[in-house]
Amino acid sequence: MINDGPLQLFEPLVNDLVKPIYADYSFANIPNTIHYLLTGENLGPLLPPDCFGGRYPHPNKIVLLFIDSFGWQFWQEYQSHFRTTRRVVEQGILTPISALFPSTTAASVSTLGLGVLPAEHALYEWNIYIPAYGEVIQSLPFRPLGKHPDDACLAKGYDPRQMLAVHETVHQRLARHGVRSIQFAHRSYASSAFNKIIQAGAEVVRHSTLAEALVKLKETISEITGKAWLSLYWGGIDAIAHAYGPGTSYHAGEIASFWQTFDYIFRDIGVTDTLYLFTADHGHVYVDPRQTIYLNERVPALAEFLPMSPTANPIYPSGSPRDIFMHVRPERFAEALTILRRTFGDVALIEPIEMALDQQLFGPQPISPELRRRLGDILILPFAGHFVWWHEPGLLNSRNYGNHGGLTREELISVMGVVDAL
């Protein structure tokens, strides 16, 4: 069945933007819910029982399929196209839930691995200013801005643990109850600096292709005994949506490739006492990158408002073309806010960061001091149909036809699909 009641809970913010949900129907509550279903221990807010048919099950195994960017809008479009999506809707329950803010993979994988909100763990975006490093870096690949290999920040002597304000993982908490956590990770990042932190306490199974990942997942489900959480993240659909845009034939083909492969491999799984969960971290919006509005090209004087870090690096805006976080020299704050609102107020919500905190866009208070230092001073949230960004040749630009991070319904409404047999 489709449990679409939560759609009415998304409150308007301004224009076509809506507020995220954290209290119940939220991606943020997936880790606590998995922990509760497998251990009986309640660590905090849970997904409501109607996501599971009215009462919480207590399976022996939980399998989480984390399909990057395949949110509510795409489930609505494709639910009748594939055997597994039809089965979730016809035999299980499909519920819209809120993504985090920002609606990004960096925030979401950190929350899923640590069990706390970005308000606490402080890693909220791909491009993010880390005060301990004195510069804006790309968080998950742990590299400086520009063209650098993954984990290049290690060569600069940066401690990757300083990216996160929290380090105990959900896997370590499950282990204290005798529950195994088995995470399926692509070889390109399985041993990365970030992944070693976020998957501490888990068994990591590596793969190179989707088919390899799904066969290994199926074999593990069939072989494992005892309580276990198995989780597979797949980023292929998101990658194509970025490169070509959602709604294109490339995007549709990648979606078909994922689900048809899944249907084929899991057509005869036949394992009982296993609960399957399907979720996403966000959706996607399309804009031609050639139409990107660059703040500092429209108003070159804005470059003078950026502060310098203690290591003499300019603190460039963090975020993406869908969510921009600007650090501004204190003495220029009022002037910067006025200029930004006057020049870009027709295409974006432009507010002091304190507004986002007061509106609890990052979740309930308190906010960790480290997150507050990273956020900067001014938040720019583009309305639907617009990319707004900062242009720094070789470092920051807008080349993607698809993006996310903002607060439109297309970006923010994710999904929780639940079924007990495939």
Q: Which residue ranges define each predicted feature?
A:
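Feature captures the catalytic ectodomains and active-site-proximal regions of enzymes
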Residues: 1-422
